[in-house]
Amino acid sequence: MSVFGLQRLYIGGGYVDATSGKTFDTFDPATGELLAQVQQASAADVDRAVASAQEGQREWAAMTAMQRSRILRRAVDLLRERNDELAALETRDTGKPIGETLAVDIVTGADVIEYYAGLATAIEGLQVPLRAESFVYTRREPLGVCAGIGAWNYPIQIACWKTAPALAAGNAMVFKPSEVTPLTALKLAEIYTEAGVPAGVFNVVQGDGSVGALLTGHPDIAKVSFTGGVETGKKVMSLAGASSLKEVTMELGGKSPLIVFDDADLDRAADIAVTANFFSSGQVCTNGTRVFVHRSIKDAFTQRVLERVKRIRVGKPTDADTNFGPLVSAAQLDKVLGFIESGKAEGAKLLAGGTRLTDGHFGSGQYVAPTVFGDCRDDMKIVREEIFGPVMSILDFESEDEVIARANDTHYGLAAGVVTENLSRAHRTIHRLEAGICWINTWGESPAEMPVGGYKQSGVGRENGITTLEHYTRIKSVQVELGRYNPVF
């Protein structure tokens, strides 16, 4: 018997049964308890969701921008009213500590919807005079039906981040959450409907990557916004282009450098490094897992990091005192443990953690101890590949030019950060780092106003910020001739 019972699809403003006859299970990563059986969408269900979205989008786009803005603001109010309920569900589904989900996941999702609700009325075109009797004007029009494909680490936040600009611009969205964490996207659908979003404007289909492929290849979808791994992202981009030249936004993986210079405040640097590696049990795409520390301060910095790691409170995610929970699944646990063994085998010095936690209640969950490796080299697997778990690699460096070259020596380019008291060095270094999201003397905050996305193979396009709204519209150019038409023939 599952905790939440059978979960259906959400299409056309309400719950409907999938036609596939298939279900999949979702589990509590802290206890192994069966949370729900979830119906998997078929190709016919995806077609139904897209058709429903097309119908709803026509009604939604016909509303004034102010009407859409007011409805989205009501959704924000409902999200905030239900913050505690949604946070508790997100904690069960992801294994994140309740203190984290209460303060971050729904809060930041609501903030982004509120931000774009405010921008909905600011979507406007241009008027360009050509000559006395002729001018051009432009219109920004919605794309139509968009697809959103979410990741398992921030389920409801990602759903909010993808729907907010899409809906603000007058589009509809068919959303597929990760099959690992499928529950809270359905609650967001309920909230949008209660707020007054027309039926079909936000539909949720469930399933694995095959359902994502159906969305990506669907001829009636105009844009795909995907969050996930690099290899899957390449497949999404290929299928989106091959099917109908869809627009794509992709936020992919990272192996981000955090550079600690010799003039850094060591306590601040250690605090930043621990947050940048162990928040959300290390399951954050922007984590600063390659920690480059100037050789002259490496020992003192490492000591401070280890002191802070000892203070991490690993425990049950539902306990208010816990600030470090399990990994999201058994598969993710096995992957992370494999990387840890690789680090040991390649000669990295294990300074903390490095094991699965199995004592007491930990034994039924997917827990791994916060892990720190020292004496790391650039060619090690734990340094070059994205782990997506609580594994910090400490490397030393001598010069600014050297560390910048090493930091950039990766096919990733999602995030980067520096810790230094020298303002000139901070900006000089950041300007040379090949990363789309950068922090100086801090790490990790992604406010609604800040565009989020990567360089290189870490992504295409951006989430959040004003620029993202533009990419959920298309420009129509119109020339108006007030004078006499001069025929060619």
Swiss-Prot record:
Site (Seems to be a necessary countercharge to the potassium cations): E247
Domain of life: Bacteria
Binding site for K(+) 2: L245, K456, G459
SUPFAM superfamilies referenced in this protein's UniProt entry, alphabetically: ALDH-like (SSF53720)
Entry EC no(s): 1.2.1.8
Active site: K162, E251, C285, E463
Disulfide bond entries: none
EC class of the enzyme, as a word: oxidoreductase
Modified residues (Cysteine sulfenic acid (-SOH)): C285
InterPro entries from the UniProt entry: Ald_DH/histidinol_DH, Ald_DH_C, Ald_DH_CS_CYS, Ald_DH_CS_GLU, Ald_DH_N, Aldehyde_DH_dom, BADH
Binding site for K(+) 1: T26, D93, V180
Alphabetized UniProt keyword annotations: Metal-binding, NAD, NADP, Oxidation, Oxidoreductase, Potassium
PROSITE patterns documented for this protein: ALDEHYDE_DEHYDR_CYS (PS00070), ALDEHYDE_DEHYDR_GLU (PS00687)
Cofactor(s) named in the record: K(+)
Residues engaged in binding NAD(+): G150, A151, W152, K176, P177, S178, E179, G229, V230, E231, T232, G253, C285, E386
Subunit and partners: Dimer of dimers.
Protein name: Betaine aldehyde dehydrogenase
Annotated source species: Burkholderia lata (strain ATCC 17760 / DSM 23089 / LMG 22485 / NCIMB 9086 / R18194 / 383)
Species lineage: Bacteria, Pseudomonadati, Pseudomonadota, Betaproteobacteria, Burkholderiales
